[in-house]
Amino acid sequence: MRFGWLEVAALTAASVANAQVFDDSHGNNQELAFSPPFYPSPWADGQGEWADAHRRAVEIVSQMTLAEKVNLTTGTGWEMDRCVGQTGSVPRLGINWGLCGQDSPLGIRFSDLNSAFPAGTNVAATWDKTLAYLRGKAMGEEFNDKGVDILLGPAAGPLGKYPDGGRIWEGFSPDPALTGVLFAETIRGIQDAGVIATAKHYIMNEQEHFRQVSEAQGYGYNITETLSSNVDDKTMHELYLWPFADAVRAGVGAVMCSYNQINNSYGCQNSQTLNKLLKAELGFQGFVMSDWSAHHSGVGSALAGLDMSMPGDISFDDGLSFWGTNLTVSVLNGTVPAWRVDDMAVRIMTAYYKVGRDRLRIPPNFSSWTRDEYGWEHFAVSEGAWTKVNDFVNVQRSHSQIIREIGAASTVLLKNKGALPLTGKEVKVGVLGEDAGSNPWGANGCPDRGCDNGTLAMAWGSGTANFPYLVTPEQAIQREVISNGGNVFAVTDNGALSQMADVASQSSVSLVFVNADSGEGYINVDGNEGDRKNLTLWKNGEAVIDTVVSHCNNTIVVIHSVGPVLIDRWYDNPNVTAIIWAGLPGQESGNSLVDVLYGRVNPSAKTPFTWGKTRKSYGAPLLSEPNNGNGAPQDDFNEGVFIDYRHFDKRNETPIYEFGHGLSYTTFGYSHLRVQALNSSSSAYVPTSGETKPAPTYGEIGSAADYLYPEGLKRITKFIYPLLNSTDLEDSSDDPNYGWEDSEYIPEGARDGSPQPLLKAGGAPGGNPTLYQDLVRVSATITNTGNVAGYEVPQLYVSLGGPNEPRVVLRKFDRIFLAPGEQKVWTTTLNRRDLANWDVEAQDWVITKHPKKVHVGSSSRKLPLRAPLPRVY
């Protein structure tokens, strides 16, 4: 007897074919992209730094019953326990409460007395590995102190294909190398604090439109399947998979699969992306969890590589689950092999031990669902004990300092005609624009920050946190001006243009604040369904700038935004004497900005994306209307690797501000480029060969009678259990299609536990170890040629030489401090991966014979140093 309805959606989507991308127009009868299957799901083996944690995981999982293993894999249901996602427990073996997973990538969501950190895009603007690590460490400390086991971040999906994508701010940058480095450092910081980090959203999750059927239908779109992101193999490896390889190499404990389909197979049951790319090729040793309600099948997802279902129920609070009881049944009847569930549990516990949860763990001391001190143990159904659910533990420590430092270090000075830094002697200062002031409803007045009222320091969605306070620009500037004996006049109503004109005409300097917001698709703000409708400024921003500029010849524009905005109509106006992009700086917004405005911090930030003249400058538009009848909308990534600055370079289009651009209060010079091959007998590339060991199993399965609900157990309504109502498995499964034959839905090889061949590009966490061998050393001299001490960000780009390759691709960067007149030699190395392309035929990384060059400078378009690279293979 076998399952039917729980897996059919997965297996019809994962048909056998080569992954391809077709044109943009799709009809119901047109051939669509497919995702080739890859089975069986690789079993973890504790490679490298994972060995000890894996050994300990095997020891405890070997003692577990089947139901206990299943309990670790399945959430208990939405709002059933204190965290946004919480697994079942194994109290018999000391796991006395379920593993707690909690948003977000910038702080603890649904909590209090926590910090609100700068967004990922701000971290990218710092180009600083240490600051990325310290932010991760500080966040990890706060999550740990609240009793959270799994931090649901950071994000590298979306990468940033679309500048108007709703959640690009949660990630870092559209450049995979910049994202990969800062992604990895954030993960190291989180996990060094003893909390499991989650690399998300894996993969190709580049827009909000059509990510979920119910959400899209709520907006009036007639679709029956979620969007499919269609990508070719080369683009997948060289662009979107790149930062996830860095995450796996950094030891990330969890990966969250995304809502979208990839080549018409759902992200959480896509055997190509989960089994092959993530587990076999990248050697991922942790566990894959679903995004919330991104789980679409039972057996299909289990065989395709999913390890944890979140939040456990199929739809929020419906009491149904693809796993839980159904996963127990599927093992008992042989549909899912025992080794697959053993591997799920081992992967979860390996991550648990690797970060030290067994030493640091405390119960969650907050409730995601209420700020009341007392409440029901199981909030959704008002059942269980009436107990203390919020202990109001202050976890902020001294993290405001690192938040303020990152805020200043991420403030990009795009333009400066001598207006900055301010001297403090300005007598009359105008502060103009709603974005300077407070949200009249309070900093947390809009649930999940789902509005654009007052200054923008955080965008909207599940990737948010409650502010403990928010220092607005108006407050910080007023404090600064008053302390220097000046006068400050603020108008923070964007409709009060005549009043703004009056203030601007009397001010020696006018600071204008404008913004543009976006977020997750379940919230619609002013017709923006997560994704932005356009790249214009919000809340009458252009009119505010026009008004002030026409009345003040010293206008400084400050932009808080989730990404690029259109500035072409005013950026070169001579009365606009400076432009600042401050991103989403978090709770210390005003303080960090004032540090830069008044010169206490010399700006060193570089824009992590390109500022184009029009939306069309960025290439293909975001898919905002269904294009495949009522089936899955098809988003074809026909641009390949050419996004952001790579696209501008290909088109020979000059942007307003190029990727990597950012001014300082001093100047820097570049000289003395040196390139040296690092020849050694061990530098030859060695494709991985051999095979795995057989799939191990741990403990005994038992019989159905072993997993019946105990007599006298008071079951919680809609709570997801791993237990059975009956020894009749069909009755326990409640599956109307129970009885299908294996041949109808089980992919070939999916249950094969015999030794499997290793992939050439695999062999260790992050991929083939020889990919990371250094082949070339590059050095350059950086000189502070000005009169102010400051940081510079040297950037190294490589021309890979092929006729269809980008002009340059970023490969290395740093942030170095230089006193006036000081010189430093910056030295870095290029490894094999930095110089290679993905060969779709060989299914491996290859350094082509095309001549290659190295370029060093201060941005993607300011590269004064260049030299040929020695031929290395």
Curated annotation (Swiss-Prot):
The keyword Disulfide bond does not apply. It catalyses: Hydrolysis of terminal, non-reducing beta-D-glucosyl residues with release of beta-D-glucose. Glycans are attached at N71, N222, N263, N326, N333, N365, N453, N534, N553, N575, N679, N725. It comes from the Eukaryota. GO terms for cellular component: extracellular region. InterPro entries: Cellulose_deg_GH3 (IPR050288), Fn3-like (IPR026891), Glyco_hydro_3_AS (IPR019800), Glyco_hydro_3_C (IPR002772), Glyco_hydro_3_C_sf (IPR036881), Glyco_hydro_3_N (IPR001764), Glyco_hydro_3_N_sf (IPR036962), Glycoside_hydrolase_SF (IPR017853). Pfam families: Fn3-like, Glyco_hydro_3, Glyco_hydro_3_C. PANTHER family: BETA-GLUCOSIDASE, BETA-GLUCOSIDASE A-RELATED. This is Probable beta-glucosidase A. The lineage of its organism: Eukaryota, Fungi, Dikarya, Ascomycota, Pezizomycotina.
